[in-house]
Amino acid sequence: MNIIEQIEKEEIARLTANKTIPAFAPGDTVVVSVNVVEGNRKRVQAYEGVVIAKRNRGLNSSFIVRKISSGEGVERTFQLYSPLIAAIEVKRRGDVRRAKLYYLRQRSGKSARIKEKLVSKAAVAAKAAQ
């Protein structure tokens, strides 16, 4: 492992020490809690939407979340290990067959819906046994 990879791995460990990042994939509906600074006030703002793309590049990993706000599609790119992200919560898992869901940009209404991924009974039983 070269020096850059080692430094990036240490930085990721430092940034994730006080928060947990759940496993999520494109198609999942997530709520991203973002720290917003307005003047001297600091507050947490929730941004809920569908993950349409995820870019895994170590420390430079990012993901794009799309939501419909007052009839208009809004996309926001987040850096996965950004200190501005307070928390990420997965609301529901989506069952998709693509890594990048850019086709959702042209869709609206019912055609933009994503089928929910159902958990098998065997997986539920295994989780309950733990």
From Swiss-Prot:
InterPro entries: Ribosomal_bL19 (IPR001857), Ribosomal_bL19_CS (IPR018257), Ribosomal_bL19_sf (IPR038657), Translation_prot_SH3-like_sf (IPR008991). GO terms for cellular component: cytosolic large ribosomal subunit. Keywords: Ribonucleoprotein, Ribosomal protein. GO terms for biological process: translation. The keyword Ribosomal protein applies. GO terms for molecular function: structural constituent of ribosome. The keyword Ribosomal protein applies. Belongs to the bacterial ribosomal protein bL19 family. This protein is located at the 30S-50S ribosomal subunit interface and may play a role in the structure and function of the aminoacyl-tRNA binding site. This is Large ribosomal subunit protein bL19. It comes from Cupriavidus necator (strain ATCC 17699 / DSM 428 / KCTC 22496 / NCIMB 10442 / H16 / Stanier 337).
